[in-house]
Curated annotation (Swiss-Prot):
Residues 660-685 are annotated as: Disordered. It comes from Lactococcus lactis subsp. cremoris (strain MG1363). This is DNA translocase FtsK. Consists of an N-terminal domain, which is sufficient for the localization to the septal ring and is required for cell division, followed by a linker domain, and a C-terminal domain, which forms the translocation motor involved in chromosome segregation. The C-terminal domain can be further subdivided into alpha, beta and gamma subdomains. The alpha and beta subdomains form the DNA pump, and the gamma subdomain is a regulatory subdomain. The DNA motor and the gamma subdomain are both required to activate XerS recombinase. PROSITE patterns: FTSK. Homohexamer. Forms a ring that surrounds DNA. Keywords: ATP-binding, Cell cycle, Cell division, Cell membrane, Chromosome partition, DNA-binding, Membrane, Nucleotide-binding, Transmembrane, Transmembrane helix. Residues 171-755 are cytoplasmic. The lineage of its organism: Bacteria, Bacillati, Bacillota, Bacilli, Lactobacillales.
Length: 755
């Protein structure tokens, strides 16, 4: 009987061990299965489990789950591994704590915000937000950050990782220390060798110099009075002094004013009594309270993320920047998401946000983010006085102008001398005229009349007429389109004359010439005036192109190519940005552009070579694309009232009267003369003048010749030939022979001469 009881107890023990092992294996597989569900976020259970883990350790959940799975597998299949490597678990714990510090610092949120982020994902059954290291991370990080600052927390994390590395690889640091000592010893040896080598070289050079000293002492006295020694003595003295004394000052003295076509000697020097307008002349614009936009931003962030999710796009709103008229949301796309998918959703996003219109910047230059620009419910007006005070332009840069306020609240300025020409386009009511007035007013508030001159063209006769009679004007504001084309040609002539002047004095640009004049005035009693900068402003380019397109285009192209060094800059404005107004040659020579609100993407591409201006809101909302940037920048232009402009102009007029330069006077024009525009009375074909000049120079005319030279069809060439005959330029047709040209290259009529 005792033997049977003993056997029964042994069998019961083995069965208990088997049952325990079975329970362990079941628990192992169930736990591993749940971990896999959580890692893959499969279904409601997987997302719920993952979010529960995230509640405590945040976005480190995936790392913790993988570590737990690895430890479970090792504990079942390699039990001795953990016993043999007891330092692994403490090392893993220290590494994990360091990661918790770093992840929570990256979140930039406290305990309450972290809990709300995780709880929103947990209740919504989703995994979207980056939540740092969860509640545990927030609990341990916030006190550490308060005690040691953010940098201190990073240092603590780095120390924990170093300790973890030491625990896992005990021999690593001693080995590194030995290697460092060996390398340091080798470096010291090499340095000592180099020092010894340098000392030896210096000693050898010293010995050689001591040996060579007697030789020059015996040669120099013999050659002291020779031609060979006298030349080197004279050359160093004469080279720096002779060109300046003999060439520079006499050039300025020997060239009288009469030899220089335009030297602006008829322009008074206003530097003595003239005072610049002060900021007190401008009215203050009350600051708009945009506190309500913060609530709108929070609401829009949720709408954006939900909309992206509904279209199957993984995207998070990283940040939002509230500007004067729009708010820019910076979107982080999931890896593998095409940017074009977001761009194509612009209408759907506008519908979801109930926005007037939105603009998508994909991607934001310099960032791996996509920008979504949404209009604000409350638009904050930017005052010109506020912008001028905050812009803080350099007083020595006369053409540095504050343009508008960017999204981050900074004032964007531009230097017209670097642009060097500017094209401004926008539909009626977009803020184009206000921007042009702001540019003019900015220059008037910085520059003396002797420093900057304006030539203004205003075919509409109402935009720039307020500036008449200011001393900065070269001539009164030009309102006749035909006179405007002549005035532009006068500016081209002035540019050529300035280049001749630069060539005569050996300078490259207006800055070099004015610097020479300043040096001359400092050394001579006879004073010369510096050349002023010239700013040509055309308020409506379309009107000029309709009347005299070829002359205007030629003048703009020539000024665009060469005028920068001569100190001449253009600002061309139009409210009809079509290709017949802004031609390809004009765009190529006017590289800096400002686009206000336009009606279509075609107009936007005409101005900026890209879409976007059709999405602008108007009232000063603009896209600025300077010459040195590849992407346009969105700005809110400043509001400048008519009263402010009138106050500045009146202040200037009260100090001095305008003294116009007759050399820029376009003179009288015949309103019925034949031009090259679309509305010419002599010919309806814009190629008529080109055809006329061609046949007069060639002294022969045929329809086939016009076809080849002008690249037009037979019908158009035939019409041109008939028009030339009607104008008395060519004779009648005589079979297949070319027509006779009745005007000589000198312009004389030779119709009566028969060969």
């Amino acid at each position: 009987m005792p033997a049977k009881k003993k056997t029964t107890r042994r069998n019961t023990k083995k069965e208990l061990q088997k049952k325990a092992a079975t329970r362990k294996m079941i628990a192992f597989f169930v736990g591993l299965l749940l971990i896999l569900f959580a890692l893959a976020r499969l279904g409601i259970v997987g997302i719920l489990l993952y979010n529960i883990v995230r509640l405590f350790i945040g976005s480190l959940a995936i790392i913790l789950l993988l570590l737990v799975a690895a430890i479970m597998i090792l504990s079942v299949f390699r039990k001795q591994f953990l016993k043999e490597n007891k330092r692994i678990i403490p090392a893993i714990i220290l590494t994990f704590i360091g990661l918790m510090f770093v992840f929570q610092i990256r979140l930039h949120q406290g305990l309450n915000e972290t809990f709300h982020l995780i709880w929103s994902d947990l209740t919504a059954g989703r995994v979207i937000h980056f939540v740092g290291s969860g509640l545990i991370g927030a609990i341990i990080t916030e006190p550490a950050k308060a005690l040691f600052s953010v940098i201190g927390v990073y240092i603590i994390a780095a120390v924990l990782w170093l300790v973890a590395i030491y625990l896992m690889i005990p021999g690593l640091f001693p080995k590194m220390r030995e290697d460092l000592h060996q390398r340091l010893a080798k470096w010291k040896e090499k340095r000592a060798e180099k020092v010894e080598a340098k000392k030896a070289v210096k000693a050898l050079k010293k010995l050689e110099e001591e040996k060579e000293i007697p030789e020059p002492q015996t040669i120099l006295p013999e050659a002291e009075n020779s031609l060979f020694t006298s030349a080197p003595v004279e050359i160093p003295i004469n080279i720096p002094e002779a060109p300046f004394e003999e060439n520079e000052n006499p050039v300025l003295e020997e060239n009288p004013v009469d030899d220089e076509p335009v030297n602006f000697m008829n322009t008074n020097n206003y530097n003595g009594n003239y005072k610049l307008p002060t900021i007190d002349l401008l009215a203050e614009v009350p600051v708009k309270n945009q506190s309500g936009e913060r609530e709108n931003v929070r609401k829009n962030i949720g709408i954006l993320e939900e909309t992206f999710k509904s279209f199957g796009i993984g995207a998070n709103v990283e940040s939002a920047v509230v500007g004067p008229s729009i708010t820019k949301y910076e979107i982080k796309l999931a890896t593998g998401t095409k940017v074009s998918r977001v761009v194509n959703l612009s209408d759907d996003l506008a519908l979801a946000l109930a926005a007037k219109d939105i603009r998508i910047e994909a991607p934001i230059p310099g960032k791996s983010l996509v920008g979504v620009e949404i209009p604000n419910a409350e638009v904050a007006m930017v005052g010109f006085r506020e912008m001028w005070e905050a812009g803080k332009t350099n007083p020595s840069k006369l053409l540095e102008i504050p343009l508008g306020k960017s999204l981050d609240g900074g004032i964007r300025t531009f230097d017209l001398t670097r642009m060097p020409h500017l094209l401004v386009a926008g539909s009626t009511g977009s803020g184009k005229s206000v921007a042009v007035n702001g540019i003019i007013t900015s220059i008037l508030m910085k520059a003396l009349p002797s420093q900057v001159k304006f030539l203004m063209v205003d075919p509409k006769m109402v935009e720039l007429s307020v500036y008449n009679d200011i001393p900065h004007l070269l001539i009164p504001v030009v309102t006749n389109p035909r006179k405007a084309s002549r005035a532009l040609q006068k500016v081209v002539d002035q540019m050529e004359e300035r280049y001749e002047l630069f060539s005569r004095y050996g300078v490259r640009n207006i800055a070099g010439y004015n610097e020479k004049v300043q040096r001359y005035n400092a050394e001579s009693d006879e004073k010369m005036l510096e050349l002023p900068l010239i700013v040509v402003i055309v308020d409506e380019l379309a009107d000029l192109m309709m009347v005299a397109s070829k002359e205007v285009e030629d003048a703009i192209i020539r000024l665009g190519q060469k005028a920068r060094a001569a100190g001449i800059h253009m600002i061309l404005a139009t409210q009809r940005p079509s290709v017949d107004v802004i031609s390809g040659l004009i765009k190529a020579n006017v590289p800096s552009r400002i686009a206000f609100a336009v009606s279509s993407g075609t107009d936007s591409r005409t101005i900026l070579d890209t879409n976007g201006a059709e999405k602008l809101l108007g009232r000063g909302d603009m896209l600025f694309k300077p010459i040195d940037e590849n992407h346009p920048v969105r700005l809110q232009g400043a509001f400048l009232s008519d009263d402010d402009v009138e106050a500045v102009v009146t202040f200037i007029k009260d100090q001095s009267e305008a003294q116009y330069d007759e050399s820029f006077d376009p003179g009288e024009v015949d309103e019925n003369q034949v031009g090259t525009g679309a509305s010419n009375t002599g010919s309806g074909d814009p190629l008529f003048e080109e055809a006329r000049n061609m046949v007069i120079i060639a002294q022969k005319a045929s329809t086939a010749q016009l076809q080849r030279a002008l690249k037009v069809g037979f019908n158009r060439a035939s019409d041109l030939m008939n028009e030339l005959e009607a104008q008395g330029i060519v004779g009648p047709a005589k079979g297949t022979t070319p027509r006779k040209v009745l005007v000589s290259p000198d312009g004389e009529f030779i119709g009566g001469v028969e060969e």
